[in-house]
Amino acid sequence: PGLIAGPKLSPRQEHDVELGWNAAKEIARLDIGQTIIIKNGTIVAVEALEGTNEAIKRGGTLAREGAVMVKVSKPNQDMRFDVPVIGIETIRIAAESGVRVIGVEAEKTLLLERDAVIALANDSNMSVLAR
């Protein structure tokens, strides 16, 4: 757990991660989706059938700049078949959409190409943290 890439979070971003975490856990429990996009305490996008990348794009359009993305696992998720994942494409789309922070669930989210994800997040001035 902790900061994986990018700058230290501001108090506002930390608050958005906390709110987004609670909301993401609830939508995951309801089997709606696993990702929330939030800015300044307001949820701007909820992942559903369209998937994470489309939720990021929609959230970025609505938030314009400085959004926070939170991705969690479902309760009792079968980690053999359905692991939450972020990778290069996630970071690229998030950066293009104005997301500045990505929070993921520690030990339950797979970072594909971890070193490349960290490098791209750092190059994009994007914080990535696990909790």
How should each PLM-predicted stretch be described?
Residues 92-131:
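C-terminal binding/interaction regions
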Residues 1-91:
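Conserved mixed alpha/beta catalytic, RNA-binding, or beta-rich assembly cores of soluble enzyme
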